[in-house]
């Protein structure tokens, strides 16, 4: 069983979702410090800022998602969005590329870096 690839857009969305839960957890920890109003307020504000940060990340990936190329995955025949030179299908995690020079090569995220020359 090889390496499991994941779509970049899904990775960023997962990060934003985790920020929501982490923020809520941090804010909830503030309840345990009810005696000290400064510590309680600090925990709640940090948690609130994490939730706001997740909103910013969701907004950013939504705007980025509108500019991506939509293709049909050759494996599952479902439409998927591609970000960069190489990416994975959102549905079946099939490695995909639009660069003819990279066809047949092993999937690697380094192909998306500007410093990489094919």
UniProtKB/Swiss-Prot annotation:
Subcellular location: Cell membrane
Keywords: Cell membrane, Membrane, Transmembrane, Transmembrane helix
Annotated transmembrane regions: 12-32, 43-63
Taxonomic superkingdom: Bacteria
Pfam family, one: DUF2614
Keyword Iron: no
Database matches in HAMAP family: UPF0295 (MF_01502)
Protein name: UPF0295 protein BcerKBAB4_0454
Organism: Bacillus mycoides (strain KBAB4) (Bacillus weihenstephanensis)
